Amino acid sequence: MNKFVLKVLWLDKSVAIALDQCAGNTTHPLTEYFFWPRKDAWEELKNQLDTYSWIPPNEAIVLLNQTTDIINCWQEEGKQYSAKKIQEKFTQCLFVGHD
């Protein structure tokens, strides 16, 4: 089981990404939601991860790569997918949004 999970709000005009820590069958928020394109969600998440010295660099890279993939998918195909459908594409993340 992963130690961390990205929670994603999949919306029409933006996508928002937050980081949670996994503990058993529950998750605990580590960050607020960072929005794209209103702000640079990737950069904000990176800056937050840089302050968490207890998150190994290799795990931070994986989380940032997932964030890149999610943002790119939203930009290219966002309105074609419901939150439920996009969850099938990014199985290691948790998605909420309109269906």
Language model segments and positions:
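The transition from N-terminal targeting/processing segments to the mature protein
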Residues: 1-99
